[in-house]
Amino acid sequence: MAYVENCNANAQFQCSEIQKNVFLIGDSIRQGYCATVKEELSPDAQVFYVSDNCRNTQYVITNLKTWANMFSNPSMVDIVHFNCGHWDIAHWCGGELPLTSEQEYKRNIKIIIDMIRKLFPNAKIIFATTTTMNPNGTIGINPRTTAEIARYNDIAVSALEGDVVVNDLFAVTNDWDSDCYADYCHFTTDAFKELGKAVAEALKKTF
């Protein structure tokens, strides 16, 4: 049985035979930069993304096949750029434990990569590290720290195999001051544009 439909003329995402086809997966941070990435890569690439917040690693695992079936031909996707981390690392409602343990996170990243390889067989895979928290120490309802994020990023990178590329968005945002943040973890409009430009540059390097 095929993992996805081979060709779907009525699919929401119609792949181009001329341009690069890029699929962005991620949480609200991705939602904040995806429009800039699309603008920066035009006209060289078509940039696709679901409107949904892709939440945590478990959510990505359970929805990847559905998203793949939104493409006219998933085998024509050239690049899949993904991140999930903020939801996994968060201590929901201030609980003692993060949503996803370190061991579970590493396992889930491996599962996601394996699924991308099956569902998008010709795509280069880029893993984006999770971005930093507001350095002013603002505590959200679902807290996490930059130190925790750094640790989970290291765990994720250790799970990568083969030719998976790392786009280190943690490094991009690590020296940003609190003026770049709209709240405890989300960025201002201008900062999201800068993040989108950084993502676009990382994608261009794989063209």
Each model region followed by its residue ranges:
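Substrate-gating cap/lid alpha-helix
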Residues: M133-L169
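Histidine-centered active-site loop/cap adjacent to the catalytic His
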Residues: V60, L64, M70, C180-F207
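Surface-exposed, active-site-proximal loop segments in enzymatic domains
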Residues: A90-L99, N134-I141, D179-A182
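Mobile beta-alpha loop/short-helix "lid" or hinge segments that flank ligand
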Residues: W87, T129-N134, N167-W176
